Structure formats: structure tokens, C-alpha cells
């Protein structure tokens, strides 16, 4: 994994979501070229994977807490 990819994975969920919203706005602009749209799409794909990872971590933590409560 590249250094850039490692740094990207440390992006907080909220920051990734904000950037995704920015990308959507940019892609909806008629002045955005096809090549730029592709680059933005690739960035968005990576950000979505990061968001999914954050969500999976939170779901796992919630399940763990729920299981602990059930055992009590």
C-alpha cells in the first residue's frame, strides 16, 4: 500500500463524507471535463470504501457492547 493510501485511510468519517459531497457538486458542474470526472469518481470510490470501513467498525463495536449487556 502506498504512503498516500495509508494516509487516506486515516481520514475521519465526517471529513470523508464532506469531501464526497464536494465531489458530487464538482461532478454536477457542466464545466467539469470527462477526465476530471473520472479522477473525481476514483477519489469518491476510495472515500466510500473508507466510510464503509468506519461504519463496519462502529457496527462491530455496537454489537460488542450489546453482547456484553446481554451477558450481564
From Swiss-Prot:
Q: What is its EC number?
A: 3.1.11.6
> Does this entry carry the keyword Nuclease?
yes
Sorted UniProt keywords: Cytoplasm, Exonuclease, Hydrolase, Nuclease
Give the signal peptide, or none: none
List where in the cell it is found. Cytoplasm
The cross-references to Pfam families, in alphabetical order and at most eight, read: Exonuc_VII_S
- Biological process terms in GO annotation: DNA catabolic process
Family according to the record: Belongs to the XseB family.
Q: What does this protein do?
A: Bidirectionally degrades single-stranded DNA into large acid-insoluble oligonucleotides, which are then degraded further into small acid-soluble oligonucleotides.
Supply the name of the protein. Exodeoxyribonuclease 7 small subunit
Amino acid at each position: 500500500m502506498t504512503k498516500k493510501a495509508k494516509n487516506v485511510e486515516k481520514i475521519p468519517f465526517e471529513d470523508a463524507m464532506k469531501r464526497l459531497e464536494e465531489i458530487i457538486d464538482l461532478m454536477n458542474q457542466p464545466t467539469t471535463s470527462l477526465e476530471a470526472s473520472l479522477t473525481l469518481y476514483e477519489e469518491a470510490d476510495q472515500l466510500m470504501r473508507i466510510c464503509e470501513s468506519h461504519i463496519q467498525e462502529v457496527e462491530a463495536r455496537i454489537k460488542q457492547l450489546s453482547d456484553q449487556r446481554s451477558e450481564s
